[in-house]
């Protein structure tokens, strides 16, 4: 779900940024680049999510990352490689901006769409911090947060084990559990 939302928002945002005739293009580009370098901070972002009623909902994870500025810059750069003659021919045939975008530009841009989908899927798959901050409900926690808790909880305190052989055996089992958990959770990325 996140990949579809993010790629859709990214593609729709990148299109006007790629057009030379878009008024305010430099202003919006400056705002987007500014947000790449300077975030709002953890506490203000949490307070905003809380006031919007998004804490303990899936939307607290999906909405803040819906527009990835770096991916928008990639899509914008790819849009600029599409010949302007396609747009001119479509406009001469009576095509609107929306028709040109969905019927001509999107089919031509399938490679960048595939790249953006891959980037967003891997980014969401690897993120657990937002879920750790915004989701208290155990039923809403993603697999990454569950894996993190398994890996953190299986730490062995050597002061509690008196027999060194037992300590080594327990450490091997804990490591085996960690590694098998990581391998099993990586299957969707490989497939």
Regions found by a protein language model. Name each.
Residues 1-191:
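A hydrophobic, multi-pass inner-membrane permease signature
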């Amino acid at each position: 779900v996140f990949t579809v939302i993010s790629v859709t928002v990214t593609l729709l945002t990148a299109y006007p940024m790629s057009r030379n005739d878009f008024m305010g293009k430099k202003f919006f580009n400056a705002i987007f680049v500014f947000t790449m370098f300077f975030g709002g901070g953890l506490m203000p972002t949490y307070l905003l999510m809380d006031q919007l009623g998004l804490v303990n909902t899936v939307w607290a994870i999906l909405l803040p990352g819906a527009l990835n500025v770096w991916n928008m810059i990639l899509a914008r750069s790819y849009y600029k490689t599409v010949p302007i003659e396609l747009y001119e021919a479509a406009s001469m045939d009576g095509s609107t901006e929306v028709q040109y975008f969905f019927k001509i530009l999107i089919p031509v841009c399938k490679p960048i769409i595939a790249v953006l989908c891959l980037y967003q899927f891997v980014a969401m798959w690897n993120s657990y911090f937002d879920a750790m901050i915004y989701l208290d409900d155990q039923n809403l926690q993603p697999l990454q947060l569950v894996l993190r808790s398994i890996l953190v909880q299986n730490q062995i305190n050597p002061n509690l084990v008196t027999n060194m052989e037992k300590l080594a055996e327990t450490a091997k089992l804990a490591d085996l559990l960690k590694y098998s958990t990581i391998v099993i959770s990586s299957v969707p990325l490989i497939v």
